[in-house]
Amino acid sequence: MTKITVVGAGSWGTALAMVLADNGHDVRIWGNRSELMDEINTKHENSRYLPGITLPSTIVAYSSLEEALVDVNVVLIVVPTKAYREVLQDMKKYVAGPTTWIHASKGIEPGTSKRISEVIEEEIPEDLIKDVVVLSGPSHAEEVGLRQATTVTSAAKRMEAAEEVQDLFMNSYFRVYTNPDIVGVELGGALKNIIALAAGITDGLGLGDNAKAALMTRGLTEIARLGRKMGGNPLTFAGLTGMGDLIVTCTSVHSRNWRAGNMLGKGHSLEEVLESMGMVVEGVRTTKAAHELAEKMEVEMPITAALYDVLFNGNNVKDAVGSLMGRVRKHEVEAIPDLL
């Protein structure tokens, strides 16, 4: 049995806490809403973020981060990307020694365009870091909460660390593979949110299956192109954290990014969409970060650029589709050299 603190009591943090508790670990979860923590402790449910799911009674919720981190040397962080530095700065006050830092957030830090593992390594002193591990893959919290079969990837620079996290989570309904490509795994999980937003727009516009299939395929090419330029293994993008996560996020009604895009495609403004969602839509911030990265690194990402113009420059979604369809003709295999 391992003592683990889950930092972040949203839908995904709560679902992962459930997996760990099902495996017999000593699980604590922290959130900044005291009434929500009380509900988890007394009613064993998180009605705001994971309604309808009965949580194991062994999960103990805290609204005090200091109390939640007592005698813990494994932490799992699942908070919005924009909150990471602030949360990490608080956490390092209370972590006592070398700790395994797992993160399961899919995004890029706004403003710096850094991967979350980079943010952790910047904010946490070396003597408090045993390993940094990423948990990512095609996994909606709603289905994990129902204990439906789910498969994800544990990635770390040190494979033994990835395997240790694999062992923490593996059970009859939650399968975990390992991968040493922490860069590719993080970027696949973050960048697919951009394509999911665009896929939602195509569905909102009623463009049909042909358009959506093309968008997803060419979107994966963009993800792999930028990922390779940043040091990721191109094979990673054909796996669970690339193609797998892209498929589930572009096709499921559980996907916040798809739902947001669908509303945009039906004519709602970005402000209306974000207000109605009630939860973080990482793809919006990631689109901005990825667009800036692509320009800086001189990587061609036409879908990302078109979505950026829709979200931040007020471009019409139909005009964006037209601009993509009207691009200069190309050979499909022109992208291949970038991926080898």
Swiss-Prot record:
Keywords: Cytoplasm, Lipid biosynthesis, Lipid metabolism, NAD, NADP, Nucleotide-binding, Oxidoreductase, Phospholipid biosynthesis, Phospholipid metabolism. The active site is at residue 192. NADPH binds at residues 11-12, 33, 106, 141, 256, 280, 282. GO terms for molecular function: glycerol-3-phosphate dehydrogenase [NAD(P)+] activity; NAD binding. PROSITE patterns: NAD_G3PDH (PS00957). It comes from the Bacteria. Signal peptide: none annotated. GO terms for biological process: carbohydrate metabolic process; glycerol-3-phosphate biosynthetic process; glycerol-3-phosphate catabolic process; glycerophospholipid metabolic process; phospholipid biosynthetic process. Sn-glycerol 3-phosphate binds at residues 106, 137, 139, 192, 245, 255-257. Pathway: Membrane lipid metabolism; glycerophospholipid metabolism. Its EC number is 1.1.1.94. InterPro entries: 6-PGluconate_DH-like_C_sf, 6PGD_dom2, G3P_DH_NAD-dep, G3P_DH_NAD-dep_C, G3P_DH_NAD-dep_N, NAD(P)-bd_dom_sf. It is found in: Cytoplasm. GO terms for cellular component: cytosol. It catalyses: sn-glycerol 3-phosphate + NAD(+) = dihydroxyacetone phosphate + NADH + H(+); sn-glycerol 3-phosphate + NADP(+) = dihydroxyacetone phosphate + NADPH + H(+). NCBIfam families: PRK00094.1-2 (NF000940), PRK00094.1-3 (NF000941), PRK00094.1-4 (NF000942). HAMAP family: NAD_Glyc3P_dehydrog (MF_00394). Catalyzes the reduction of the glycolytic intermediate dihydroxyacetone phosphate (DHAP) to sn-glycerol 3-phosphate (G3P), the key precursor for phospholipid synthesis. Belongs to the NAD-dependent glycerol-3-phosphate dehydrogenase family. This is Glycerol-3-phosphate dehydrogenase [NAD(P)+]. It comes from Bacillus anthracis. The gene is gpsA.
